[in-house]
Amino acid sequence: KGQVEISINSFSDNPQSLGVMPEGSFFGEMSLLESKPRSATIIACSDEVTVLEVSETDFSKLLLEAASITYRLLLTLNNRLNNMLDRIEPDDKRFVFKYKKNPIYTTIQKMDVRTFDSIAKKDPDYVWELLKYLSSSLEKLNREYISQKSI
């Protein structure tokens, strides 16, 4: 319930906003997917914010047992990656091209829920690799975006 602002520290240790996440959004998945410390800070935009905390164990179990939730996570991460690619302004256009032409990225762009469900049943490790790829790519792009804003 409510909205939160997501920010990450820039190289000068000043928090830089990546934007406001609307009600119903999820966050913290990058840390859970990669078993790394969180890279972002979340700040409530009002006194009326309610969040649900999910342990790493429960998160992993949920992703393995609920393909529809995993598919939604995959699409959401892909959309966030795509939105960040649209927001950054690289001097070298090959930077954006590298992500948009990556076979993993293009596969996800075309994947429907049935295809995803079939892949998830046959090869759950591949699904984890897709999620981790998107997560690490998004973190890199977030850092690139913040470094551009700091200049």
Features from the language model and the residues they span:
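Short, flexible helix-adjacent loops and helix caps
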Residues: 9-11, 89, 146
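Glycine- and acidic-residue-biased ligand/ion/polar-headgroup-sensing regions
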Residues: 1-12, 23-24, 106
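Phosphate-/nucleic-acid-contacting segments
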Residues: 98, 103-151
